[in-house]
Amino acid sequence: MEIVRDIKTMREKVAEMKRQGKSVGLVPTMGYLHEGHLALIDTARKENDVVVVSDFVNPLQFGPNEDYLVYPRDMDRDAQLCSEHGVDFLFVPTVEEMYPKKGNQVDVFVDVKHLDENLCGRFRPGHFRGVVTVVTKLFNIVSPNRAYFGMKDIQQLRIIEEMVNDLNMNIEIVPVPTVREPSGLALSSRNTYLSAEEREKAASIYKSLLMAKDLILEKGVISTAEVIGTCTRFLSQQGFKVQYFQLVDYDTLELLPKIEPPQKIIIATAVFLGKVRLIDNLVIEVR
């Protein structure tokens, strides 16, 4: 495995691979890799001749009071895991390399409309603008045939799918299912902020999603307000501060006033456990 730190070299390496007729898969990450990231890497490894992992904590997608400065980082461990999982190139640019203007200023962004109005986008203004801008930069640098994103960040995945479609990018976006602990807790780099007791309690997040699924698919509840109310009360009783619990249309990410089959629905929530913000979702099809 080769570690690449600058854009020029990364482009040259990929261009050489493509001249040899090789396909390239990109796994964009913010580092501090866990089994969820490794599932993305392993999927990319099976489907491409060359695998590139980017390891970059992107300041553009953090709000002023969020955890950019303390976001967990362990570059040596990330490099070891990437090497063990057959990664060909680990791209680790600095902030100055990605945003070279004075003060890391960015004057041109890729913007998002409508798709960021609900779920996390409603509570993290500017977040998805930062995400799609850096992903566009990575796509331009690496020119992958395929790029891999986890379904745990479902709004991010859907926005990137639409971006690629709307901007005619010749890249296949490959969704990879959420990886969970045995308790059901979705793997996340931010889980490292949790104590052992909090980690145990956090398993209730997934239980709330399963509860919503059961209410809709098994009990036939058609009122989304009823589903949301039941699940929000459950989470509150478990000690969470619920930022949102929403049911949205898979394609448009618009809030659903009621269940009307056939529908593909994202059941999603964001909660605080102490100061730690955790998200999770489940995708269901109502026939």
Curated annotation (Swiss-Prot):
Q: Any idea of its EC number? A: 6.3.2.1
Q: What keywords would UniProt list here?
A: ATP-binding, Cytoplasm, Ligase, Nucleotide-binding, Pantothenate biosynthesis
The active-site annotation reads 37 (proton donor)
GO MF term (any one): pantoate-beta-alanine ligase activity
The record ties this protein, via InterPro entries, to:
Cyt_trans-like, Pantoate_ligase, Pantoate_ligase_C, Rossmann-like_a/b/a_fold
Binding of ATP, residues? 30-37, 150-153, 179, 187-190
State the pathway, as annotated in the record.
Cofactor biosynthesis; (R)-pantothenate biosynthesis; (R)-pantothenate from (R)-pantoate and beta-alanine: step 1/1
- Regions that span the bilayer: none
- Where, in this chain's numbering, is (R)-pantoate bound? 61, 156
Database matches in Gene3D superfamilies: HUPs, Pantoate-beta-alanine ligase, C-terminal domain
Q: What class of enzyme is it?
A: ligase
CDD domains according to UniProt: PanC
Q: How does it assemble?
A: Homodimer.
- Family the entry assigns: Belongs to the pantothenate synthetase family.
Q: What protein is this chain from?
A: Pantothenate synthetase
In the UniProt record, the gene name given for this protein reads: panC
